Amino acid sequence: MFENTLQGALIGVTVIPTLILSLPTTSFVRYAIYPLPALLVLRALLWPPTEGLAKETYLLGLLMTDTSFKMFDYLYLQGYNAPAKFLQVDRVGRTITKVHEYPKDTLGQVKWALSLVTSHRGIGWNIQVPLQKIKYPSSRVAYIFESMVSILSIYLGLYTCGSLCDYMVQVLRKEADSPYPWVYGLFKNSIFQMVVAFMGIFAMVSNSVLVYNLARMICVTSGIKGDWGKIESWPNMFGGFEDAWSIRNVWGRAWHQNLRRCLTAPGEKVSSLIFGSSPKLGRVPRLIRRYFLVFSAFGVSGLLHSLAVYYGSKTDTMPYEDSTPLHMRPGWYVTGYFFYIQPFAITLEDFICWATGTSTESKGVKATKVRWFVGMVYTLTWFTWGTAVLWIHPQLASLGYQRTSDAELGYVHILVSTSEAASILPLNPWPAVVKTVSPTFWDVYGYFKSSGLGGYLYLYAYTTLEILGGSGFNVLKSASSVV
């Protein structure tokens, strides 16, 4: 029925939980199929797919693992009687103003289950993730316009990222001579390798944001009934860049909160058994509980991402010649290093701020420009280094890729994967825009060239347009002769 166990598990943790939650708690059918999602996930773990491309299997594994963690919370962690734990609510700010009763009719129960399973960050429920103060557009038209601008901006970023990666791949493979020989030398630099790894993360994250923006624009534009058609149900996926002034703030405010519930729920459950109710705790137990939750959340996050690599690392077919044989790869669990180290960094950061009396409140930090700037610099440095060294390198190694199989290829596999990721979603309008603009550019370029103005400025403009136009390096050598 399904091509492999992973695909079956993905269907099992999306469709079946909705059916289970739609049925009365006393239903025999509900009892019968209740363990089925867990069994399908267990089957995928014990008998993972062994054929196919590692990258595709990794992405499918990440999606399945993410969804299964979420459904584990809804179905098993909170107990059999989900309607008693998950409540639809109305809010004004962070205050719950109304609690809706569980529907009595079958159709209402199906809608209730579907709303819970598809809820974004628990919005409209008592499990809603804390949101930053959001200023929503004043009208539906303004909201649609804002979404369109975001979509076009993301498409432009993906197009530019993919084009640059194609450019660098041809340089590394020496498929054409480049007027910029220093580009090849950049890939021997560890810092630039980190930047390249960061581009891969950008492409993957941008695809998620793009899909999210398309979905919210369609739902709000169509005026679909229920929570999906409300503007308030679709806040921006990420916080503001200006809030990335500390490691804790990056994870708590700037980064997306889509997984927050499923990552924190296991720790919350264990801490409630150990510490009891938080308001009743003394200062020291409350502090211990606070950091226990931080460590447990990142522990679950590391496991989630590692399991995705576990599936990808089991595939035999590798798309690059520099692939490492299956028996020589490091363990799939090395991917979790990046996430396991984050709570230690946050704890150290908190201790230093406490010991030096440095403000950790958003208003206090932003009021002092030096404090904000220093925080932004060290945070960006930490994530640029950590993403490459603690995440990308171990993950690629476990999937079979070597960091530098030889001095010439180096990071070519990351660039190829990033380019493919940047072009995976269709309907990108920018290639057509560049193709349309090109004739006009050449006319203007010829005019200024004939007038003797420009120099290297026009060479750079020429090269940029050729890269974005997808013509590669076949014209770059001749471009150097125009100055």
Curated annotation (Swiss-Prot):
One of its GO terms (cellular component) is membrane. Its EC number is 2.3.1.-. Induction: Expression is down-regulated by the cluster-specific transcription factor AOL_s00215g275. Expression is also down-regulated by the HOG1-MAPK pathway downstream transcription factor MSN2. Disruption phenotype: Does not lead to any change in metabolic profile of A.oligospora grown on PDB. It holds the Pfam family MBOAT_2. InterPro entries: Wax_synthase, Wax_synthase_dom. The chain crosses the membrane at residues 9-29, 33-53, 141-161, 191-211, 292-312, 334-354, 372-392, 453-473. It comes from the Eukaryota. GO terms for molecular function: O-acyltransferase activity. Keywords: Acyltransferase, Membrane, Transferase, Transmembrane, Transmembrane helix. Its main location: membrane. It is found in: Membrane. The keyword Ligase does not apply. Pathway: Secondary metabolite biosynthesis; terpenoid biosynthesis. It is a multi-pass membrane protein. GO terms for biological process: terpenoid biosynthetic process. Acetyltransferase; part of the gene cluster that mediates the biosynthesis of sesquiterpenyl epoxy-cyclohexenoids (SECs) such as anthrobotrisins and arthrosporols, metabolites that possess a novel hybrid carbon skeleton consisting of a polyketide-derived epoxycyclohexenol combined with a terpenoid-derived monocyclic sesquiterpenol substructure (PKS-PTS hybrid). The SEC pathway plays an important role for fungal soil colonization via decreasing fungal nematode-capturing ability. The role of the acetyltransferase in SEC biosynthesis has still to be determined. Belongs to the wax synthase family. This is Acetyltransferase AOL_s00215g273. It comes from Arthrobotrys oligospora (strain ATCC 24927 / CBS 115.81 / DSM 1491). The lineage of its organism: Eukaryota, Fungi, Dikarya, Ascomycota, Pezizomycotina.
